[in-house]
């Protein structure tokens, strides 16, 4: 009895091993997938796949670089809040900020506008002239912070269609090959058509992070620009008060 049970167990184990080996062999010998799509694809299919890869790399590059830039701006905002307003005057406060700080750039442009209110510019109301100088500087900062966001918007809106084009082109080529071979069995149709559908999945995989990254960065830009606008408004008030007391550049 025990020997019979042992024999049945050994036979079952052998069948499991053989089944696992067969499944492993099928996985290894799978003729479909990304590698087959690249190996069997024509110039158009390969170019489409490369475009999607480039779009993905570009969008991730923009996301990480803009994220680092926004973190720097928020750090500069904390420095300006703690150092700038404790200075003796606007010039000393600007000199105490980092060289590449947008807040230093705005302060210097505000000082430049206040000091160049002469000649024809002197006919402009001083309050309006200082306001314009600071506003131009803030617009410059905002423009720099928005650089690259158009790339994410473009990738997010076009990548699905690029992937869809690759799918349509792949299905067309698959149907042509099937028609030329004269065989329309499921094993002949499923593989090429499935490979073509991968293009749509890749297009969506490229577009979704770009759209999410765009919305996230736009929101963070809004928060950063609130700090910039608050600084500009306070600087405008300080420059007007300094001009009235004659201490703007002392």
Regions found by a protein language model. Name each.
Residues 36-65:
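Hydrophobic alpha-helical transmembrane segments
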Residues 25-41:
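Interfacial loop/helix-cap signal at membrane boundaries in integral membrane proteins
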Residues 196-212:
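Hydrophobic alpha-helical transmembrane segments of polytopic membrane proteins
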Residues 48-51, 55-58, 159-162, 166-169, ...:
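Residue-level signal for the membrane-embedded core of alpha-helical transmembrane segments
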């Amino acid at each position: 009895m025990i020997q019979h049970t042992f024999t049945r167990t050994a036979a079952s184990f052998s069948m499991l091993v053989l089944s696992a080996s067969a499944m492993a062999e099928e996985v290894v010998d799978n003729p479909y997938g990304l590698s087959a799509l690249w190996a069997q694809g024509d110039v158009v299919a390969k170019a489409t796949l490369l475009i999607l890869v480039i779009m993905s790399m570009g969008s991730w590059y923009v996301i990480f670089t803009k994220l680092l830039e926004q973190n720097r701006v928020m750090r500069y905002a904390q420095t300006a809040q703690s150092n700038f307003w404790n200075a003796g005057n606007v010039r000393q406060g600007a000199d105490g900020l980092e060289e590449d700080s947008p807040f230093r750039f705005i302060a210097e442009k505000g000082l430049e506008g206040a000091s160049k209110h002469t000649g024809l510019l002197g006919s402009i109301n001083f309050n309006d002239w200082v306001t314009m100088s600071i506003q131009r500087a803030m617009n410059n900062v905002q423009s720099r912070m928005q650089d690259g966001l158009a790339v994410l918007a473009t990738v997010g809106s076009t990548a699905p269609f690029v992937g869809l084009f690759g799918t349509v082109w792949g299905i067309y080529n698959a149907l042509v090959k099937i028609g030329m071979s004269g065989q329309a069995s499921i094993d002949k149709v499923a593989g090429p058509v499935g490979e073509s559908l991968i293009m749509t999945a890749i297009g969506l995989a490229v577009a979704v992070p770009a759209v999410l990254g765009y919305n996230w960065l736009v929101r963070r830009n809004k928060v950063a620009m609130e700090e910039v606008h608050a600084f500009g408004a306070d600087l405008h008030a300080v420059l007007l008060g300094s001009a009235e007391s004659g201490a703007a550049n002392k």
